[in-house]
Amino acid sequence: ALIFSLTSCSLDGGADESTEEMGNSMSSADREYLNVSDNIGSEPVIGKPDGIAPTQLVSRDIVVGTGTQVVSTSTLTVHYVLISWATGEVLQSSWSGAPAVFPLSGVIQGWQQGMPGMKAGGRRLLVIPPELAYGASGSGPIGPNETLAFVVDVVSVD
């Protein structure tokens, strides 16, 4: 499998999180979607997607956070990497600058459905089919009918 080597960055306030709870690491069933490093607070290392893209939303915790839980009305501060399922290419990443801040209600349906329940301090994989993302029109570097994979670190929840 091809692994992208990404530059590591420190995240202010990044404390060591407990890794004793179940669900902190991806199971072998989850790894069929995508290999993602669990180095919370640093830019994730992401393997190239393998196989046919899922047709349903995939929302899997890689690291379970211990902070405030995301709800539909939350404003999130996150670091994320977005890759194309088809090519494995990184399309966007917040890791080269400050974390992104936005209301969950203002983003694509895949995030609105896949982020609630996550806790600050965690890392989650979202694999989002086109109908919950940008559909047939695409957007910027995102092609039409493209399945997207996001790796999201929640820094804080307001």
What annotation goes with each model-predicted range?
Residues A1-D158:
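Cross-family detector of peptidyl-prolyl cis-trans isomerase
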